[in-house]
């Protein structure tokens, strides 16, 4: 039987700290009314930056966990779905949040299609989900010790 490398708990904790910092910055935007958010053009760029970094962290940790298991994924969305299928995160949570992986791809590869309204709505609807990913990852990491 093949032996897989142990999780790098330090890496996971460092990435979670980064995610938490970015979510904290995003909470400033989520508490603004949309008109106020839209009025200052800098808000869009800052929000996009922090959201991309938070999502990159979520996906990097997911990929790290899966790299220690006999699982193959071909894209970011499969990372989230595989985590659900394996019970690392609840399957319904994975289904609900798989679009965050697609959103990360859109922010990176077709960023010009993302409106200020769309990025604002993501900060309104998904910051708690990003925080929940961190909780699930820490729970899983603790069980692996």
Where in this protein do the model-derived segments appear?
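Solvent-exposed interaction patches of small proteins and small membrane subunits
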Residues: 1-145
